[in-house]
UniProtKB/Swiss-Prot annotation:
Gene: HBB
Tissue: Red blood cells.
Family, similarity comment: Belongs to the globin family.
Protein name: Hemoglobin subunit beta
Statement: the UniProt record of this protein carries the keyword Acetylation: yes
Function: Involved in oxygen transport from the lung to the various peripheral tissues.
SUPFAM superfamilies from the UniProt entry: Globin-like
Keywords (A to Z) from UniProt: Acetylation, Heme, Iron, Metal-binding, Oxygen transport, Phosphoprotein, S-nitrosylation, Transport
Organism: Ailurus fulgens (Himalayan red panda)
Residues modified as N6-acetyllysine: 59, 82, 144
InterPro entries attached to this UniProt entry: Globin (IPR000971), Globin-like_sf (IPR009050), Globin/Proto (IPR012292), Hemoglobin_b (IPR002337), Hemoglobin_oxygen_transport (IPR050056)
Complexes and interactors: Heterotetramer of two alpha chains and two beta chains.
Length: 146
């Protein structure tokens, strides 16, 4: 992903304030609630029967944290997202058979959650930079599908 110096500063500046546990669980939970067909990849997570069940599910929260920790690694390697996410791309493609469109959906949900958490601080410029990043990460995760 090519970001200007200003965009990189905006992304890393905001990310340094992100509570990965909280935001990760909320982002994955919202994905599962807003796009319920994505739940089929999480059969082992137990009760996903209602929005409250999803948002309170400890396995959703734990996996959301894991997802955002990987995203954090991506932010440290913006110039090599394909390399950073190669193993995860392979896992999600070959073993889990996740629809690569879901990576885009999760990226967009993450942007919504960041906007919700940071309010006025999440300016249109910050959003534009994050949209570039989540699109780059989604492309890197979809790489093994091509």
């Amino acid at each position: 992903v090519h970001l200007t110096g200003e965009e990189k500063a905006a992304v890393t500046g905001l990310w340094s304030k992100v509570n990965v546990d909280e935001v990760g669980g909320e982002a994955l939970g919202r994905l599962l609630v807003v796009y319920p067909w994505t739940q089929r990849f999480f059969d082992s997570f137990g009760d996903l029967s209602s929005p409250d069940a999803v948002m309170g599910n400890p396995k959703v929260k734990a996996h959301g944290k894991k997802v955002l920790n990987s995203f954090s690694e991506g932010l440290k390697n913006l110039d090599n997202l394909k390399g950073t996410f190669a193993k995860l791309s392979e896992l999600h493609c070959d073993k889990l058979h996740v629809d690569p469109e879901n990576f885009k959906l999760l990226g967009n949900v993450l942007v919504c959650v960041l906007a919700h958490h940071f309010g006025k601080e999440f300016t249109p410029q910050v959003q534009a930079a994050y949209q570039k990043v989540v699109a780059g990460v989604a492309n890197a995760l979809a790489h093994k599908y091509h």
